[in-house]
Swiss-Prot record:
The record marks 93 as: Stabilizes the basic form of H active site to accept a proton. Monomer. The record marks 10 as: Discriminates between blocked and unblocked aminoacyl-tRNA. TRNA binds at residues 15, 66, 68, 114. InterPro entries: Pept_tRNA_hydro, Pept_tRNA_hydro_CS, Pept_tRNA_hydro_sf. Its EC number is 3.1.1.29. SUPFAM superfamilies: Peptidyl-tRNA hydrolase-like. GO terms for biological process: protein quality control for misfolded or incompletely synthesized proteins; rescue of stalled ribosome. One of its GO terms (cellular component) is cytoplasm. HAMAP family: Pept_tRNA_hydro_bact (MF_00083). This is Peptidyl-tRNA hydrolase. The gene is pth. The active site is at 20 (proton acceptor). Hydrolyzes ribosome-free peptidyl-tRNAs (with 1 or more amino acids incorporated), which drop off the ribosome during protein synthesis, or as a result of ribosome stalling. Catalyzes the release of premature peptidyl moieties from peptidyl-tRNA molecules trapped in stalled 50S ribosomal subunits, and thus maintains levels of free tRNAs and 50S ribosomes.
């Protein structure tokens, strides 16, 4: 397997439309594009699939634990397929970017994101790639939890969907090793 792509979010219908599920939205859109059917894989506790795209074998992982327990499923699938951390791309919501923005980044801190914090712990490293999908910030730290656990207004959802589209548009360059070109294209929007 060439890459493991993981989308972070919270499982269940009550969370499906919340901002915190931007990673799920991104991975599901990708799965639909490459014709992959995500199915429950009990041994990893995630919805999983394999697919071929851009001449590469991809693993798709959507953890079915809550956000703060995302690391275990991603680590388990990565270990099974012997995928090194630097070949993992984690798609997640990002408070520090406005709706409509997206960024590719390797490594770094978790910035208070509990899904990334758990991934750092489970993988034993921060040296994995992140696709950060902007959801905006509510303005005050005390408002963060209700903000990420609520649905964005339609205008913001449209911007988030556009960022997901642009992100998936640069994914072939990224996966084939043209990371600078992918970042330049995505970050210039």
């Amino acid at each position: 397997m060439d890459w493991l792509l993981a989308g972070l979010g919270n499982p269940g219908a009550e969370y499906a439309r919340t901002r915190h599920n931007a990673g799920f939205w991104t991975l599901q859109t990708l799965a639909d594009r490459v014709g992959a059917s995500l199915r429950m894989e009990k041994r990893w506790h995630c919805l999983a699939a394999t697919a071929r795209a851009s001449g590469l074998e991809l693993g798709l992982c959507m953890p079915q634990d809550f956000m703060n327990r995302s690391g275990g499923p991603v680590q388990a699938m990565a270990a099974f397929y012997k995928v090194a951390a630097e070949r993992i791309l984690v798609m997640h919501d990002e408070l520090d970017l406005p709706p409509g923005a997206a960024r590719l980044k390797r490594g770094g801190g978790h910035g208070g994101h509990n899904g990334l914090r758990d991934l750092d712990r489970a993988l034993g490293t921060r040296d994995y790639w992140r696709l950060r999908i902007g959801i905006g910030h509510p303005g005050h730290k005390d408002a963060v939890i209700p903000y990420v656990l609520s649905a964005p207004p339609p205008a913001d959802k449209t911007l988030i969907d556009e960022a997901i589209e642009r992100s998936l548009g640069v994914l072939p360059d990224f996966l084939c090793g043209r990371t600078d070109a992918a970042q330049k294209s995505l970050h210039s929007d």
